[in-house]
C-alpha cells in the first residue's frame, strides 16, 4: 500500500454548482441555528421574515465547492484516512443564491513518521463575476503511510492562554443532528449507518467533524463578530475526537487582540483544538 506521491502539485477543476436559498437554510439548521430559540437566528433560517434579509453562515463555505476531479491519493485502506484539520477564508458575505466554480490543488504530502499528512487547497469563485468567494485548506491524516522520506512540514505554535476563556458558548446538539447535516451533501454512512459505525469501532453513528466545525463557527460569528458575517474572515482548527449526536458542545474563545484562539469540548474531551480565528475590521 503506497501513497501516490506523483500527484503532488496536481490541480483540477471541481466543476460548477448552484446553491439556492433553501440550501443555505438547510445548512444553517444542520449546524444548529435556531434549535434552542427559533426566533434568535431568523436571518440564517428564513428567507421571508419581514425586515430580516436572509444571510448565510460563513462556514457554509466548507460545503459549496464542487465534488470530485481530484487525483487518486494512493492505494491504501480508506478506513485509515482521517480528517485532520480544516481552514476556510471567506472574502465577504456569501450570497443566499449563487452559481460557483471550484478548483483544487494537492498542496503536499508530509511524512509524520509512522503516518502521513495530505494537504489539499481549494478556491470557489462566482461563475458570473469571477469574484473569489472562499478558499479552503483541508488536511487528511493517513495512518500507517509515513516513512516515505518526504518533508515533515511545519507546525504553527499554539497554546491555551493562561486564563479563563473570554467567551464560553454552549450549544446542545440534537440526537438526529447527523441526519440533518448529511442533507447538505456529506452522505458518508459512518454518520447514519449503525452497522458501519460499529465496524469502525463506535457504539453508534458519530457526528460529522464539519458539523462540529459549523457549530463552532456559529459561536465565533456571534461572540467575535457581533453576528455579522461580513466580519468573519478565516477559521482554522484541528479535529481531535469524535462527537456523538446529542452531546453538548462548549466553545472556549480567547481574545488575543490580533486574533481569537479557540477550542471546542464535548464533556471532558477536546474535539476541536488549536483553533485560530481572524475577523475583518468594520
Where are each of the predicted segments found?
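Hydrophobic, proline/glycine-rich low-complexity stretches
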Residues: 1-99
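Short, glycine- and charge-enriched coil/turn segments that flank and shape catalytic ligand pockets
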Residues: 36-37, 126-131, 225-228
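Phosphate-binding glycine-rich loops and adjacent basic patches that engage nucleotide phosphates
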Residues: 20, 62-68, 139-145, 173-184
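A contiguous, surface-exposed recognition patch within enzymatic or periplasmic domains that forms
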Residues: 2-45, 156-212, 219-222
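HotDog/MaoC-like acyl-thioester-processing domains
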Residues: 1-8, 12, 64, 81-169, ...
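Generic structural signal for residues positioned in beta-strands
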Residues: 26, 43, 58-59, 87, ...
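Catalytic-pocket segment enriched in acidic/His residues
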Residues: 195-270
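Flexible, active-site-adjacent loop/turn segments at secondary-structure boundaries
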Residues: 42, 55-58, 79-80, 92, ...
Amino acid at each position: 500500500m503506497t501513497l501516490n506521491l506523483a500527484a503532488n502539485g496536481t490541480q483540477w477543476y471541481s466543476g460548477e454548482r448552484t446553491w439556492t436559498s433553501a440550501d443555505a437554510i438547510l445548512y444553517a439548521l444542520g449546524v444548529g441555528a435556531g434549535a434552542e430559540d427559533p426566533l434568535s437566528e431568523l436571518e440564517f433560517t428564513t428567507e421571508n421574515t419581514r425586515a430580516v434579509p436572509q444571510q448565510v453562515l460563513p462556514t457554509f463555505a466548507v460545503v459549496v465547492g464542487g465534488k470530485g476531479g481530484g487525483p487518486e491519493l494512493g492505494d491504501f485502506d480508506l478506513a485509515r484516512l482521517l480528517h485532520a484539520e480544516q481552514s476556510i477564508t471567506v472574502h465577504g458575505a456569501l450570497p443566499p443564491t449563487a452559481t460557483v466554480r471550484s478548483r483544487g490543488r494537492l498542496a503536499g504530502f508530509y511524512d509524520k513518521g509512522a503516518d502521513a499528512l495530505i494537504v489539499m487547497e481549494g478556491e470557489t469563485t462566482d461563475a458570473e463575476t469571477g469574484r473569489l468567494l472562499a478558499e479552503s485548506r483541508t488536511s487528511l491524516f493517513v495512518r500507517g503511510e509515513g516513512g516515505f522520506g518526504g518533508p515533515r512540514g511545519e507546525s504553527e505554535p499554539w497554546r491555551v492562554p493562561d486564563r479563563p476563556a473570554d467567551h464560553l458558548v454552549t450549544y446542545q446538539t440534537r440526537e438526529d443532528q447527523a441526519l440533518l447535516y448529511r442533507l447538505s451533501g456529506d452522505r458518508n454512512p459512518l454518520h447514519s449507518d449503525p452497522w458501519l459505525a460499529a465496524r469502525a469501532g463506535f457504539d453508534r453513528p458519530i457526528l460529522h467533524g464539519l458539523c462540529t466545525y459549523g457549530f463552532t463557527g456559529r459561536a465565533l460569528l456571534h461572540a467575535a463578530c457581533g453576528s455579522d458575517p461580513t466580519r468573519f474572515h478565516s477559521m482554522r482548527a484541528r479535529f481531535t475526537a469524535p462527537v456523538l449526536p446529542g452531546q453538548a458542545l462548549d466553545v472556549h474563545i480567547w481574545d488575543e487582540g490580533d486574533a481569537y484562539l479557540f477550542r471546542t469540548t464535548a464533556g471532558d474531551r477536546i474535539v476541536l483544538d488549536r483553533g485560530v480565528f481572524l475577523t475583518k475590521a468594520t
